[in-house]
Each structure stands twice: as C-alpha cells, then as structure tokens.
Amino acid sequence: MSDNPADLPVLVAGGGIGGLAAALALVRRGFSVKVLEQAPEIGEIGAGIQLGPNAFHAFDALGIGEKARGRAVYTDEMVMHDAIDGSLVGRIPTGEAFRQRFGNPYAVIHRVDVHLSLLEGAQETGKVEFLTSTRALRIEQDEGSVTVYDQHGNAHKGIALIGADGVKSVVREQFVGDAARVTGHVVYRAVVDKKDFPESLQWNAASIWVGPNCHLVHYPLRGGEQYNVVVTFHSRQPEQWGVTEGSKEEVQSYFQGICPQARQLIDLPKTWKRWATADREPIGQWSFGRVTLLGDAAHPTTQYMAQGACMAMEDGVTLGEALRVNNNDFPKAFELYQRSRVARTARIVLSSREMGRIYHAQGVERLVRNDLWKGRTPERFYDAMEWLYGWNVGNCLAKD
C-alpha cells in the first residue's frame, strides 16, 4: 500500500468483541492485523446479550451475518412488568412489522456465540495474527508507525494501533488518563437449562421486571434450550469495577419485596457471576495520530440500553468506512471515525444512565413510569427507537 511501504500490520490491543470487529473491518480494507490479547487465550466470558437491528447491520457489513444469525434466538416481543405487583407495563412487538421498519430483527444470543462468530470470521481470512498473554504497557508513535511494548519487553510495530482493551484500557490510560466511574450498581448473570426454568416464564421475549433500585431480565438462548437470567441491584457497600463469583445469599437479600413470579428467578441459578459495573464520562477526543480507541476503551457504558457490544461492532464498521473514504490514511480516517462516533456513543452512555433510573424508579416516580408506558402503541415505541436502530453502514459516517 502506498502509505505502508514496509507492509506493517495494524495493531489491535484486545481480542474481545470490539477488537475482533476492528480486525475484520481492517482486513476488508486490505490490511493484515496483529491482535495483542492479555488473556492466555482468545475467548469471552458472560452470558446472554441482546442484539438490535443495528447489530445485524454491523454483522452483515463485517461479513459474518450468516454465522451470527444461525446462533441467535429471534424474539416475538420485548416485555416489561412491574416487579412489585406483577402488572404489565408495556410490550414492544419485534416481529414482521419491526423487521420491516428497521430492516433487521431483534434477537438474543449468548455473548460467547457473538465472539465466536467474529473469531471464526477473523481466522478464516488468514490475515489476523493472535498473540495471547500479551499486555500492552507503553505506546510510541512517529509519523509513519506505532510501536507497542508489552510486559515481556517485546516491541510490536504497526502502521496504526486500535485500543480495544476494555474498561481498564492501557491505551486510554496513556493518551487520556481519566478514571472510570464506578456506578455502585451490581449485575448478577447466570444461564439456566430449559428443564430447570419455570414453564410459566418460558416466553419467546426479552423480558424485564422493573423494581425499586433493582430489575430482573430473562430470555431464551441457544434455540431455547437455555435461559439467560440477569439481575441488577444498587449495592449497599462500596464497589470496585470487576468480575467475581456471585453469592446466592447476597443476591437473595436484595429482592425481598418483589412479586413471587419474578422472585422465583433468583432461586434458579446454581452459580452466578457478579459484575460491579462502571462507565466513564463521555469524551470528545479518543484519536491521537495513528492511535485510536474503540468499544469499551472509548465509551464504556452501563447495561441499561443493551448496547455495549452493539456499539463496539458499529465502531469497527465505521472505522473501516472511514479508512475507505480516506484512502487508508490512518490519521485522517481516525479523525473522521471519531467525529462520526462521539455524539452517538455519548448519547448511549447518558441514555443508559437515565434508563437505569427509570427502570429502578420507586414511589411516585414508579407510578409515573408505568402510566407513561402503558398503552403506548408499537409505532410510538418504534419512532422512539429510530435514532438507535436506524443505524447502518450507509449512514454511519459524519457529514461535512
């Protein structure tokens, strides 16, 4: 390539969903990629995640639409119940009318299956090298290249660096230096086999029960053979961001006042994973010469909009498009990528905080929430979602 005479790879710090999305987008632009992953193997942890139409637009743009579609479960609706009295607050059909409106379905899927689809796609290109047990420590750049020094003292040289190394991003720490914002909200996640899941709750829906300072989510996974269970509460103790083993006693202690139908979800999992959540204040710059940030490294968000993985994949697609229109000029492309993503991802971060407040409303605020959403037509819900689900590769770049 004209701007890469030494045929250097593009370096990607992080082999999660965002890093792999970036790798696929870069390969589609003709680059080879070296992924530096600090874990001993390329993999993913977690449970289920929700995928809006924007995620499927991203899958298609990255060339893995068929793989991802084959692993997803397609819901009939999104349903919200009040966790105190069990009443229906609202429902949003996600069938044919939804698909026609947004051009793609709404689905639920195991996070591991999203990662696997991306990983298979990257491996099949033959253009992505993976280095595991490799943690970026320091980055240097000059006019034509970037060098990443790892914990073993090795130097990795590339034409550019994508920092997709998560909430605790080393790349962000060097170039931005801000602190993560620990929310005090704790998420417990588990997967339950269908045979152990109550028949009365085996709905083909993304279901949420909203309560004071808490909520519960469940939906089917893997052809309906498993169910994802996610519960969130406001912790009584100081928290630090991270993932640990969950405690049945702890999670049960936070859901004493909810209705029996929702309460039974707490007793189902044999084991839980516990996430103390964090986000960051939105920033206006995350591109620095030949270095840029992507996914949680750029705009970590809480889970209330169900858009963390979706935003990372959108980032990858947008990055590829920015390179295309800038003839693979990385500094210029990174500027356009940043300009195209800052406002949208900031809106996700801030909207997610507000959605958490609405979900966890109590007292009179709870009554107002329920009245606002009861009886709302699907069309009104769809109109409110247009800014989110209307994203696609054709409109992803900022206009001059």
Swiss-Prot record:
Optimum pH is 8.4. Coiled coil: none annotated. Its cofactor is FAD. GO terms for biological process: catabolic process. Gene3D superfamilies: FAD/NAD(P)-binding domain (3.50.50.60). It catalyses: 3-hydroxybenzoate + NADH + O2 + H(+) = 2,5-dihydroxybenzoate + NAD(+) + H2O. It comes from the Bacteria. InterPro entries: FAD-bd, FAD-dep_Monooxygenase_BioMet, FAD/NAD-bd_sf. Optimum temperature is 30 degrees Celsius. Its EC number is 1.14.13.24. Keywords: Aromatic hydrocarbons catabolism, FAD, Flavoprotein, Monooxygenase, NAD, NADP, Oxidoreductase. GO terms for molecular function: 3-hydroxybenzoate 6-monooxygenase activity; FAD binding. Monomer. PANTHER family: GERANYLGERANYL DIPHOSPHATE REDUCTASE, MONOOXYGENASE. Belongs to the 3-hydroxybenzoate 6-hydroxylase family. Catalyzes the NAD- or NADP-dependent conversion of 3-hydroxybenzoate to gentisate. The affinity of the enzyme toward NAD is twice as high as for NADP. This is 3-hydroxybenzoate 6-hydroxylase. It comes from Polaromonas naphthalenivorans (strain CJ2).
